[in-house]
Swiss-Prot record:
PROSITE patterns: SH3 (PS50002), ZF_RING_1 (PS00518), ZF_RING_2 (PS50089). PANTHER family: CIN85 AND CD2AP RELATED, ISOFORM J, SH3 DOMAIN-CONTAINING. This is E3 ubiquitin-protein ligase SH3RF1. It holds the Pfam family SH3_1. One of its GO terms (molecular function) is zinc ion binding. One of its GO terms (biological process) is regulation of CD4-positive, alpha-beta T cell differentiation. The gene is Sh3rf1. InterPro entries: Endophilin_SH3RF, SH3-like_dom_sf, SH3_domain, SH3RF1/SH3RF3_SH3_4, SH3RF1_SH3_2, Znf_RING, Znf_RING/FYVE/PHD, Znf_RING_CS.
Amino acid sequence: MDESALLDLLECPVCLERLDASAKVLPCQHTFCKRCLLGIVGSRNELRCPECRTLVGSGVDELPSNILLVRLLDGIKQRPWKPGPGGGGSTTCTNVLRAQGSTVVNCGSKDLQSPQCGQQPRVQAWSPPVRGIPQLPCAKALYNYEGKEPGDLKFSKGDIIILRRQVDENWYHGEVNGVHGFFPTNFVQIIKPLPQPPPQCKALYDFEVKDKEADKDCLPFAKDDVLTVIRRVDENWAEGMLADKIGIFPISYVEFNSAAKQLIEWDKPPVPGVDTAECPSATAAQSSSASKHSDTKKNTRKRHSFTSLTMANKSSQASQNRHSMEISPPVLISSSNPTAAARISELSGLSCSAPSQVHISTTGLIVTPPPSSPVTTGPSFTFPTDVPYQAALGTMNPPLPPPPLLATTVLASTPSGATAAAVAAAAAAVAAGVGPRPAVGSTEQIAHLRPQTRPSVYVAIYPYTPRKEDELELRKGEMFLVFERCQDGWYKGTSMHTSKIGVFPGNYVAPVTRAVTNASQAKVPMSTAGQASRGVTMVSPSTAGGPAQKPQGNGVAGNPSVVPTAVVSAAHIQTSPQAKVLLHMTGQMTVNQARNAVRTVAAHNQERPTAAVTPIQVQNAACIGPASVGLPHHSLASQPLPPMVGPAAHIAAVNINRTSVPLACAAGASSLASPNMTTAALETEPSGRTVTILPGLPTSPESAASACGNSSAVKPDKDSKKEKKGLLKLLSGASTKRKPRVSPPASPTLDVELGSGEVPLQGAVGPELPLGGVHGRVGSCPTDGDGPVAAGTAALAQDAFHRKTSSLDSAVPIAPPPRQACSSLGPVMNEARPVVCERHRVVVSYPPQSEAELELKEGDIVFVHKKREDGWFKGTLQRNGKTGLFPGSFVENI
């Protein structure tokens, strides 16, 4: 081993300065310079090994010197270097290695002929420089550049440009003939790159230590502080230095520069059962999949990397590969702060992809998705080592300059190397046999478009009781942040409610994706089907408007331009073979009716936040008709829709009085007073009536009439056809402005019996906003891909019960074997609890901390249907019809 390589190893792991004879060795056999040890004792009043955190009982002066280090240093000083055959012995290679600053001094033309000097990697690391090129970091111009904006550096082809700093992967700041300015990266070839900055990180959040005695190993810092990264301790913690203090800190609280990312990736402990080959390199240069030539180092830093943190007085020979004089390997300890470790989830893709930023607060955990597209970069020009330099220059044309500096600015909080693709789950429009169905990929196909190492949000669709200590308890509707998907079907993640970290079966949860919708497309949220393609599609709220379509033929509407989306609740995701269809009511109603409709909302039996998305307001909605349907993922293939079959329910009137049942349907196209709610206007006389709706019994299209807005008398005679047609005139939605109706489910036939004084209407249904004291949802979605199903009931009553069939809480899966793929799911029917609502007024505004929470404004009226033990309420906001969680201290009972 020559002198240069040996001296690179003899540096302090803390300050990265060269060790000398005054360095001390600790009882754990780790060696550090005396200055660093004295600084640790002065700041913390105790001495712990920065590598393994072992407490040292003796003082710094009492520690022994490293005998091996002293002998190595003495041997280097006393070893004479033989001059080369051409003379020049007065200049030794040691002088080269001790050169300070960014300038590297050559041994001279005679010394370069020396065998000893010729073996030095620092001198021979690059090909012999062209004559006249300074030994500073420099580049050679490939083309003429005239400059596009003031401050740009103008140069001609062949000019040698001295590099001062790298602004981002597209721009450099350099100097030519004493003139400074900016120039694009793809106009030059880097001959000698800039020295890599030290491994540092920038604090994204404040990290405070409450119990200083218990958390004395932690390194507190404030937002925007710059820390020097020393090493990675475990999966969630790293060790660093701030000023003269050394300690550990959570990885998810900081953003690393390129050098620190490489260091963290090197120190990352191996995870059994996880394919680490899917994680790309930490450097952004490898994303171009070009040559591995050293010139690609120019792309290792983004604009938001900490290039300004480069130490100007740092020697260019300072290697980033830190090595300590350790005889035994350091002991990797777990977090000394279990409370803090439980709150911080691991972001395993820190250097691999764009992780979601996790904002931890006292009220919830918000997951902010990464940017949808990376920064546009210009083409990079790299040359293989076997291609002659002049030949490569002659075969290239001038490239297009990259975007200007201001156009490519990236926020500092954006993770480096953000390459997350924007996944848009387009929905299929329900058409009466007209037009093909747009192709939509399944959840698994969509998941492959995103980086596999990015933490994903999942929702529990079945409860699971842990059997081992490292397993998590799953409660239906609970949100989880998954950051590892093991090969045996188990997931590792953290609960967004309890912040506990553990493993759980993968087929008990479903991914939550956000679909991007437009007003010009049909909005149909994808339901779940099977176990391999489960998922919840959360549709972003937007204004859905457009002209209504006129009916075709027997009152069946044509292909509408807008199909409003339904509310997708995480607590009602159906993964059985018959996936449930979620609908919400459409039509017009008065303000009082809208308020009354909100008073009774289905109370779902879960204790933790669920993913709820507000429905989208519909302009020119139909009087009565299905608002939206859920499609199984596998049924969203690129194939045409089957033609309409007609109403999807057979209505049998039982014990109906001979009094008339007026049904008021406003045909106008005005929006509701409630901005995010659409319901059907229903008025009925109080009388004892019982109507049974039998979904699954198909009826002919001729049974759909085209009358709406008038009152009709239903008489219980033996002519059932006349009765059915009389009701279907009002219930089929066959008006001048309506949505198309879809085919009935294949199986099974489900009955919903409604109490006295109720008139359920097929077609006027809603998943969260029924009109009376009853919320009945029936029907299932077939898995044979024959189209979605619209079926359900809603009625006017104050004292009734709530029953759901084929809903999520009635399906109990079979417990999975230990650490193996879970078995199939067996549905079991069950009944829910009746709905109890209380009116509350908001006294203090509350901003939501997650999508499962409600935004409260002072003076709002909230209908509370559940009060939890932890002080949180679940209710529906009267202002917009949203259902969610909120702290009970922000409202008062009225």
